[in-house]
């Protein structure tokens, strides 16, 4: 399996990601041609050059805005930190239009980009929109994009999607993401690093802080990673095929570079079939045994893989019951609704799991009492055990007026012959 491994020891910004993709082998001409499909060529030009930080050479990308050629990208200029999209800090001012999410959707959907690139680009923008909306108590279509709605950030995000699909890798892996430290100026004033949007986008993902007193991961970079990453590991076992460096604009105490590696991971292929599943759980302390039993029957009838109860003791020493339901990943929403409908719970925990299953087959066994269906468990093509179907055994016990245990005994004798 070929992967991209993002080594974010110095964080990530949108321009550094584009630079790393070009350094990895994406054709600059191809990228520029694809970006032209947005119809924004009168707003920007892409400057691609070679640069170095702390002796590490790589590719640098500058998105030069058509009306701002006088805005120089000097390494020492205090407005050009790794801090924000193209290493601009939050307080730089662009005079071009700051589009909102609806504007961006119309721009991308009306372009000639392929559908995969469109979908990925919009997914990244929606991650930013959701973060901004939560922070500002708004909706994704009402919230005002600041830097992320600017031309250079649109180029960063759509460019990232173009490069991702051009490389055709199997998965994207990532190290812990360095966020930096200190404070940064943004549209709402001076904010601690990470910026609120960055923090919201990366919620639940492994990060580090304090390598430098600058913003090292921007909202754009964070959203790109959050959309692409399949797995996090600081020390993956992999065979590196190629290493690329995207050069940042500021010269920090540590190399201001984004290292991205094309690598191969040996997959341990299991011959055992697995099923992506969900374990849904809730605790109930105000339903009778009869009501719980009826709920279990209903959930099983509706197609749950398994349902069981566990006795627990809750707060104030109240006896209660944990309902655990196993279902397929695609049926998660269906069974959450059924649990809410048929029980008194107000909340459900969902755990993503992978269920490993054996192949099964069925055959008929003739006994002195009658025919019984046998279920066979198969491992590596061989039957490792068999058991009679309960309902057949119950029917024979009732038919002959004998205990169920006697039916099982007779089946056992036949199988010994």
UniProtKB/Swiss-Prot annotation:
Repressor keyword on record: no
Annotated region described as Disordered, given as residue ranges: 69-99
Superkingdom per UniProt: Bacteria
Single GO MF annotation: lyase activity
Keyword Membrane: no
Pfam families, A to Z: Ni_insertion
Entry keywords, A to Z: Nickel
Record Gene3D superfamilies: mk0293 like domain, Transcriptional regulatory protein pf0864 domain like
Positions with biased composition (Basic residues): 74-99
Transmembrane annotation, as ranges: none
HAMAP family recorded: LarC
Family, as annotated: Belongs to the LarC family.
Protein name per its UniProtKB record: Putative nickel insertion protein
Biological source species: Maridesulfovibrio salexigens (strain ATCC 14822 / DSM 2638 / NCIMB 8403 / VKM B-1763) (Desulfovibrio salexigens)
């Amino acid at each position: 399996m070929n992967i991209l491994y993002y080594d974010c020891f110095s964080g990530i910004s949108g321009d550094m990601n584009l630079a790393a993709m070009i350094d990895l082998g994406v054709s600059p001409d191809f990228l520029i041609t694809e970006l032209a499909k947005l119809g924004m060529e009168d707003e920007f030009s892409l400057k691609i050059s070679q640069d170095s930080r702390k002796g590490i050479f790589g590719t640098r990308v500058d998105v030069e805005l058509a009306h701002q050629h006088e805005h120089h990208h000097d390494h020492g200029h205090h407005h050009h930190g790794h801090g924000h999209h193209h290493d601009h800090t939050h307080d730089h001012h662009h005079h071009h239009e700051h589009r909102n999410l609806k504007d961006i959707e119309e721009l991308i959907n009306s372009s000639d980009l392929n559908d995969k690139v469109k979908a990925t680009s919009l997914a990244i923008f929606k991650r930013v929109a959701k973060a901004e909306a939560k922070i500002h108590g708004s909706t994704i279509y009402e919230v005002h994009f600041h830097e992320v709605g600017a031309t250079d950030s649109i180029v960063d995000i759509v460019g990232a999607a173009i490069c991702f699909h051009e490389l055709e890798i199997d998965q994207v892996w990532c190290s812990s993401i360095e966020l930096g430290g200190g404070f940064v100026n943004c549209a709402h004033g001076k904010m601690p690093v990470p910026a609120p949007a960055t923090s919201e986008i990366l919620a639940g993902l492994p990060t580090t802080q304090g390598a430098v007193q600058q913003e090292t991961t921007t909202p754009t970079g964070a959203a790109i990673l959050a959309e692409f990453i399949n797995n996090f590991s600081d020390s993956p076992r992999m065979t590196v095929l190629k290493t690329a460096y995207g050069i940042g604009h500021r010269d920090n105490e540590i190399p201001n570079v984004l290292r991205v590696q094309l690598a191969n991971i040996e997959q341990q292929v299991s011959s055992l079939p697995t099923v992506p599943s969900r374990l849904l759980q809730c605790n109930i302390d105000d339903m009778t045994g009869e009501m719980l039993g009826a709920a279990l029957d209903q959930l099983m009838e509706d197609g749950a893989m398994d349902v069981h109860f566990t006795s627990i003791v809750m707060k104030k020493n109240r006896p209660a019951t944990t309902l655990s339901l196993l279902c397929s990943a695609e049926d998660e929403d269906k069974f959450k609704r059924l649990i809410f409908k048929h029980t008194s719970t107000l909340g459900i925990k969902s755990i993503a799991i992978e269920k490993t299953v054996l192949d099964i087959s069925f055959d008929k066994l003739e006994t002195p009492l009658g025919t019984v269906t046998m279920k066979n468990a198969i491992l590596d093509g061989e039957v490792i055990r068999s058991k009679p179907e309960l309902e057949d055994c119950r029917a024979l016990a009732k038919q002959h007026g004998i205990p169920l245990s006697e039916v099982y005994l007779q089946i056992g004798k036949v199988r010994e012959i």
